[in-house]
């Protein structure tokens, strides 16, 4: 018979754990000093005893609901106008339990996230910025930091509290978030709440709400992969149930084997999970963003990308997923999403094209509605990945918010952005947007960091001339008599001098990357590939990276095993209609004939053309055919030249392989 005292303890423990006895609670985003979002419904939520009535009172409103079986409840207050009057939010549970949150303001709320440059505190910013923050409190500004934490599951709460923006409270707060919020209070004259949730060194993947991956065909594989490895999803639960069934069968089989003194059978492996970590695939959204959902906010700030360097246009797709997912989770489908383009920095001699590719990928995010990009080409430090001029970064983000979100007239929000290119004989004309009153340079010298090239993609420095009163630059180069393409600031440490007359810098561009003006999008860009003779030294990264640089170690190379033919096969991810391929070889190596073939299933390949390259010459060619569906494109190397330089003739080299299909 169970001891009565033990029975009592069991009853008390069950009551304490059960939702029916849950104490009335609010998440930490509702603490004294909070700012509520104006001009839209205000969600208030928490937990209480199951079935109990919950009443919320604020600013003359009183609304009620009942807690669900799991104790959760939510009430949406009617939209409120901005107010700097500190008022009390009262939440009462049927039976007498009551909570009060004091000194609540109503205004604008923004969520700032990313990696170290967003996390970078005022205390480590430039002295001028520190002096501004130390000069006194900002009465209309409140700040909240979500502490660093990881979780494989979506959490409901976090440890943190709102604070008034005083010199002491903001010293270790995000400098970008602080100066952005401060700027809004000055321009709007209403309360502003800045929520900061970032982690230095984090990749974009752990910040994703997986709902954002839906509807992006090129991320379908990523979506399916994550679903099958994320605890709590239907796909993972199905795999786990199957694993448990197999484990039970194994236990029975193991017991029989033990009884019969036979070797135990192999134990079933548990379904794999996404790796947890701020630099991995999972964890920061679940613990640092989701606990804020569905708090009323106006928009998002984002400063990240260094940890995803090398992904090129794949980063654009991940940004799209991030933006869609956050907007969906917070219930704000048109919320502004403002982000910072990375500053120049020397990441290494073998990564010269990686940062320009991310710059272009970030600029392509502007095609999504209600987005904005602050360019930082002129305020970085090529020797320091953490430039300290954070107040100017924040000012440039605020220009987008003030112009687009708040409709302030007369604001030029962006610097010059590439608009179109025109060929004019021996010259190329580049027209920019973002320069309504014309172009200039910050040092009074001719525009720097422009290059032009012919069909061989061999870029040479170009002289640049600004057309008076126009957003137009004319480029020429004595080394390229018939230019067909141009690029600007296509170096990781580039600090060009071109800007608009409002002082905002021009963004880097490439007229033919990632989209060819005639052929459209390169379908092979960033796609995976496999080689029949893999290079053991890692010279296999350059085939689909979008760079025609062709330097040793950065282009594609097979191994040097004797015996030809060899081949490399690109997987486009799904069957696509294709009609053109562009490929080339570096000036070194013994690559001779390259044969291209297509396949829908990866087994049966059909040859569509070939090209023979001369030795010791950087060269590129283009093959065209009647459009046909293909998922796999293979480059085969049936032969080679004799040994021409220091490289073994059994290596096969390619600088790049691009694939094009009909434009959508």
Language-model segment annotations:
Residues 512-526, 661-664:
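Low-complexity, Pro/Thr/Ser/Gly/Ala-rich linker/spacer regions in secreted
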Residues 57-59, 453, 489-491, 532, ...:
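Predominantly extracellular/luminal cell-surface or secreted proteins
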Residues 22-519:
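Cell-envelope and extracellular/periplasmic
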Residues 1-9:
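Bacterial N-terminal signal peptides that target proteins for export
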Residues 519, 538, 548-609, 617-664:
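Aromatic, loop-rich ligand-recognition surfaces of beta-strand-rich domains
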Residues 519-549:
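Predominantly extracellular/luminal regions of secreted and cell-surface proteins
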């Amino acid at each position: 018979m169970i001891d009565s005292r033990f029975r009592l303890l069991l009853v008390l423990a069950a009551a304490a754990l059960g939702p029916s006895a849950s104490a009335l609670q609010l998440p930490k985003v509702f603490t004294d000093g909070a700012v509520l979002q104006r001009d839209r419904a205000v969600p208030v939520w928490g937990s209480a005893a199951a079935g109990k009535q919950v009443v919320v009172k604020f600013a003359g409103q009183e609304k009620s609901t009942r807690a669900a079986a799991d104790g959760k409840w939510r009430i949406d207050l009617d939209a409120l106008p901005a107010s700097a009057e500190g008022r009390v939010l009262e939440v009462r549970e049927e039976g007498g339990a009551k909570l009060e949150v004091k000194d609540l303001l109503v205004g604008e709320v923004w969520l700032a996230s990313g990696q170290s440059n967003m996390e970078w505190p005022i205390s480590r910013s430039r002295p001028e910025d520190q002096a501004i923050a130390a000069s006194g409190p900002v009465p209309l500004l409140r700040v909240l930091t979500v502490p660093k934490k990881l979780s494989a599951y979506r959490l409901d709460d976090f440890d943190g509290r709102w604070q008034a923006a005083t010199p002491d409270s903001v010293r270790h707060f995000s400098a970008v978030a602080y100066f952005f919020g401060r700027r809004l209070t000055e321009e709007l004259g209403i309360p502003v709440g800045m929520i900061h949730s970032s982690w230095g060194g984090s990749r974009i993947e752990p910040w994703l709400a997986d709902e954002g991956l839906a509807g992006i065909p090129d991320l379908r594989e990523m979506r399916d992969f994550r679903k099958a490895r994320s605890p709590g999803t239907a796909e993972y639960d199905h795999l786990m149930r199957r694993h448990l069934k197999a484990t039970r069968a194994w236990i029975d089989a193991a017991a029989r084997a033990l009884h019969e003194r036979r070797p135990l059978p192999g134990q079933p492996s548990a379904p794999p999970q996404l790796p947890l970590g701020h630099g991995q695939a999972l964890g920061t959204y679940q613990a640092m963003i989701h606990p804020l959902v569905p708090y009323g906010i106006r928009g998002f700030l984002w400063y990240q990308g260094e940890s995803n360097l090398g992904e090129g246009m794949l980063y654009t797709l991940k940004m799209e997923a991030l933006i869609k997912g956050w907007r969906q989770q917070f219930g704000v489908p048109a919320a502004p999403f403002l982000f910072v383009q990375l500053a120049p920095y020397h990441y290494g001699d073998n990564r010269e094209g990686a940062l320009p590719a991310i710059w272009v990928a970030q600029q392509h995010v502007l095609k999504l509605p209600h987005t904005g990009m602050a360019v930082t080409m002129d305020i970085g430090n090529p020797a320091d990945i953490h430039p300290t001029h954070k107040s100017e970064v924040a000012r440039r983000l605020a220009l987008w918010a003030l112009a687009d979100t708040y409709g302030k007239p007369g604001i030029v929000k962006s610097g010059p952005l590439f608009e179109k290119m025109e060929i004019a004989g021996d010259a190329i004309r580049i027209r920019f947007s973002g320069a309504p009153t014309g172009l200039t340079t910050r040092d009074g010298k001719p525009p720097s960091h422009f290059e032009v090239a012919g069909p061989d993609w061999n870029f040479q420095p170009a002289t640049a001339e600004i057309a008076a009163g126009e957003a137009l630059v004319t480029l020429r180069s004595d080394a390229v008599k018939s230019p067909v393409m141009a690029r600007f600031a296509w170096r990781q440490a580039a600090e060009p001098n071109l800007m608009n007359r409002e002082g905002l810098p021009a963004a880097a561009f490439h007229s033919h990357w990632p989209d060819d003006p005639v052929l459209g999008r390169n379908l092979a860009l960033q796609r995976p590939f496999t080689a029949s003779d893999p290079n053991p030294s890692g010279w296999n990264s350059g085939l689909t990276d979008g760079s025609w640089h062709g330097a040793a170690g950065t282009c594609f190379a097979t191994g040097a095993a004797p015996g030809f033919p060899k081949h490399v096969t690109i997987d486009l991810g799904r069957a696509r209609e294709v009609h053109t391929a562009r490929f080339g070889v570096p000036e070194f190596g013994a690559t001779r004939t390259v044969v291209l073939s297509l396949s829908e299933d990866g087994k049966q390949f059909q040859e569509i053309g070939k090209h023979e390259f001369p030795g010791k010459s950087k060269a590129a060619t283009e093959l065209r055919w009647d459009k046909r569906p293909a998922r796999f494109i293979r480059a085969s190397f049936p032969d080679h030249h004799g040994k021409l330089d220091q490289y073994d003739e059994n290596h096969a080299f390619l600088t790049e392989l691009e694939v094009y299909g009909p434009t959508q």
